[in-house]
Regions:
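A structural signal for the main folded, soluble domain(s) of proteins
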Residues: 36, 129-134, 320, 326-330
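Acidic-and-aromatic substrate-binding clefts and catalytic sites of carbohydrate-active enzymes
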Residues: 14-26, 48-65, 88-92, 141-150, ...
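Metal-dependent polysaccharide deacetylase catalytic core of the NodB/CE4 family, i.e.
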Residues: 41, 48-146, 204, 208, ...
Length: 334
């Protein structure tokens, strides 16, 4: 039994460049409209620390419109998850430019008290933004998917109500940050964890529902659509040699010729999405009684066209595959 969760990381670029209007507000509005068309719920992973700093520093007048959009999405039944890039926590905005602390790029590598401060700030911002003093996020996604070393961050997040994480993508690795999700490949469609997010633990307190991935030849990832998205960032050069160097740097994290391809409706072509879903359905036919949560991912900053996500939702509707949220799925996982 397949249940698909459509998630979007709701944020601007990680170095602070780009406008809220172009990278968050407008793409999210069109995505919400597309979800409404197909009557599907959405999970928005809101980069709360980023927005808190933008509001505090008065860096972008569109922040009020973003907050209004979040409130409307929340009131309309979409799920709001917590997403944190800690380099924003004490960021400053001077002369039209953000100065972020990239030494604090991985939340999990910060001192315990620092993690507490960052998470507290993020949750308080969300309560105020949603005008709901009782708001408690059920679901978390780590910035840049960095959720190792898992403790003490997991315990702190648990204390704030987090019961589901969706940071892992099977086969993923970030050598620079000491993150390795390759051992999660055989963990199943979801699992409980505590000490290490990639290690299944029967009595774990948090459930991991990973971003769906499949291992593919690295060369198959170099498509015109992905390259166009990379070009759109202000910190990627447009010359061909630089593009190739950028991709090679990504693949240095892997010792084989296989690369984990996320189910990413911003970066995948219609054909890639179709093939991925056909494989998932084929696998489900072997054990239709088994619950198989499938997490698709996108980023507002990457949402340049809507043909792929519209096709994905159409495909799911045609094949009568349920689209849900983490919150709605949670009772079935206990």
């Amino acid at each position: 039994m397949i249940e698909v969760i459509i998630t979007i990381d709701y944020e601007i670029y990680g170095d602070g460049t780009g406008s809220l209007k172009k990278l968050v507000l407008e793409p999210a509005a069109l995505l919400l409209k597309t979800c409404s068309k197909w009557r599907t719920p959405l999970v928005l992973f809101v980069e709360a620390v980023e927005f808190e700093r933008i509001m505090r520093q008065r860096a972008d007048p569109a922040i009020e419109l973003v907050i209004n959009q979040l409130k409307m999405a929340y009131q309309n039944g979409h799920e709001i998850g917590l997403h944190i890039h800690p380099q924003w926590h004490k960021g400053t905005y001077q002369k039209g430019k953000w100065h972020l602390n990239n030494i604090e790029y991985n939340l999990c590598q910060l001192p315990e008290e620092r993690i507490k401060d960052v998470v507290f700030q993020a949750v308080e911002f969300m309560k105020n933004a949603l005008e709901d003093s009782k708001f408690s996020p059920l679901t978390f996604r780590a910035g840049n998917w960095l959720f190792q070393p898992t403790q003490p961050a997991a315990r702190i997040l648990y204390d704030y109500g987090i019961r589901i994480d969706s940071s892992v993508f099977k086969g993923g690795r970030f050598k620079e940050y000491g993150v390795d999700y390759r051992k999660a490949i055989n963990n199943g469609y979801y699992w409980k964890f505590w000490e290490d997010v990639a290690t299944s633990l029967d009595n774990g307190r948090i459930i991991e529902i990973p971003i769906y991935t499949k291992m593919v030849p690295f060369w198959s990832m170099i498509t015109s659509k992905r390259l166009q998205i990379e070009k759109s960032t202000q910190h990627i050069s447009k010359d061909k040699k630089s593009e190739l160097a950028m991709w090679l740097s990504k693949f240095r994290n892997y010792l084989s010729l296989k690369y984990p391809q996320k189910l990413d409706f911003c970066r995948m072509t219609i054909r890639e999405l179709e093939q991925a879903m056909e494989e998932i359905i084929k696998e489900d036919n072997k054990t239709p009684e088994q619950l198989k949560p499938i997490v698709a991912i996108g980023h507002t900053k990457d949402l340049k066209t809507f043909d792929s996500v519209d096709y994905l939702l159409k495909f799911l509707a045609y094949n009568e595959i349920k689209v849900t949220t983490f919150k709605n799925l949670y009772p079935a996982l206990l």
